[in-house]
């Protein structure tokens, strides 16, 4: 008979490891920020597997988001979208709403990048509604969401709607002191020559 902490595969269960999920996530995000996309991906794959084995749905949702981010960074948009979709399913069940909105926005960003504006728009709108309910603490996230939605409107010929969204995003970026966001919105709002 195998010891209680060893699976038939011979691997230790996650509960016997010394690294917590939060430590693992921190390593994965650090690797991502430092350009180690393959390392980040490997860390989050391990975290997804471990969280699934543990039945830890909050950690699984976060690990799926991290894996989605790594896949997107690598350029594997289809896999990234799949991971964000999985995380969204979990966040719809367990919350919190801000995590759901984050996940929806990133999935929408990918759909927009894949030239699928009709699929991206409802996700942006849902994320926008959640962020507006969150108030001041979510202003930067709301600005990013409005920017993405404005780009969808722009790509589908809705110039007036796009302009209004870029104006709202610019004001929020200014309030959050994100000059790159302000500059992009101002460029989009400037008359074309």
Model-predicted segments: where are they?
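Structural signature of alpha-solenoid helical repeat junctions
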Residues: 19, 59, 79, 99, ...
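Eukaryotic all-alpha helical interaction scaffolds
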Residues: 44, 51, 91, 131-133, ...
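Short coil/turn linkers that connect adjacent helices within long alpha-helical scaffolds
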Residues: 12-15, 34, 52-56, 90-96, ...
């Amino acid at each position: 008979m195998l010891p209680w902490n060893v699976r038939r595969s011979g691997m230790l269960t996650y509960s016997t490891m010394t690294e917590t999920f939060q430590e693992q996530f921190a390593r994965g995000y650090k690797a991502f920020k430092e350009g180690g996309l393959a390392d980040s991906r490997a860390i989050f794959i391990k975290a997804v597997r471990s969280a699934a084995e543990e039945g830890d749905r909050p950690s699984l949702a976060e690990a799926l988001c991290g894996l989605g981010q790594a896949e997107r960074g690598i350029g594997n948009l289809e896999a990234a979208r799949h991971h964000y979709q999985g995380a969204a399913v979990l966040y719809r069940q367990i919350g919190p709403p801000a995590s759901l909105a984050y996940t929806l926005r990133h999935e929408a960003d990918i759909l927009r990048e894949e030239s699928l504006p009709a699929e991206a728009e409802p996700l942006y709108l849902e994320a926008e509604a959640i962020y507006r309910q969150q108030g001041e603490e979510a202003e930067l996230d709301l600005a990013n969401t409005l920017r993405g939605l404005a780009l969808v409107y722009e790509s589908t010929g809705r110039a007036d709607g796009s302009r209004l969204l870029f104006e709202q995003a610019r004001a929020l970026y200014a309030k959050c002191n994100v000059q790159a966001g302000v500059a992009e919105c101002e460029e989009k709002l400037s008359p074309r020559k």
